Amino acid sequence: MSKRVVLTIDDIPQMVTKNMVDYLVKNNIPAVMFAVGENIEKHFDTVVYAIKNGITVGNHSYSHPSFSAISYEEGIEEIEKTEVLINKAYEEAGLPRKVKAFRFPYIDKGGDKKELFQRYLRENGFMKIDDSEIEAKSYYLVGHDKDIDVACSFDIREYNVPSNDMTFDEVMLHLREGDGEDGADIMNRDGYNIVLFHSHDDTEKVVPKYYVTILDELLNAGVIFTESEWKN
């Protein structure tokens, strides 16, 4: 057995994203990065750079809304506007887009519209990371295994630092200790997890190179970052 992790990174592209890509390439860490359409329009070349460097880019909506707070039609528009931008980035990179993946902002799957969104994603060729080996009970309790969007089994929670909801020391403690008896533990127990991380300029301003500190910690603990396997 081993400690295996699929690394997923939300909210690209931002100013820090290119440096994160360089770190990932240097350390041979594969990753799936979920892009926000508005951010693609601001930093289009960064998305192209990520694709050229082996990053799989997925869809994270256009304006990052809570999908339970918008209509079904608005949600579809959020997805489709971003699809156009991602396809354009792959075309500019000169590489085929082999995977269509979507992650809901805040993992908010639409509330009473959830099944409508799930049907849309399935009917339009979206895929999910293979989650058949995840052991964290919490992942199954909320039904992530039954859905086609990409969720996660372990949330690093570093995005809480700029708002002072968590200190960086508390983030590192959470990283080292895991989510408790029924949750995921990516550093101390063998297993397989889909990990949620973020590319955030706000976090970089508070803790410069936060991504280096966190990912180095995982590498030093013997975590193996694996390529994502996809399924319909």
Q: For the regions a protein language model found, what residue spans apply to each?
A:
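Active-site beta->alpha N-cap acidic-glycine motif
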Residues: 1-104, 110, 217, 224, ...
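Residue-level preference for the first positions of well-ordered beta-strands
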Residues: 4-5, 192-194
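Catalytic domains of cell-wall/extracellular-matrix polysaccharide-remodeling enzymes
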Residues: 41, 66-193, 201-218
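Short loop/turn segments at strand-loop or loop-helix junctions that form parts
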Residues: 60-62, 133, 198
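Short beta-strand edge/turn micro-motifs at domain boundaries
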Residues: 131, 222-226
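Conserved active-site loop/cleft motifs that coordinate metal ions or position small ligands
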Residues: 194-198, 227-228
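C-terminal accessory extensions appended to soluble enzyme cores
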Residues: 210, 230-232
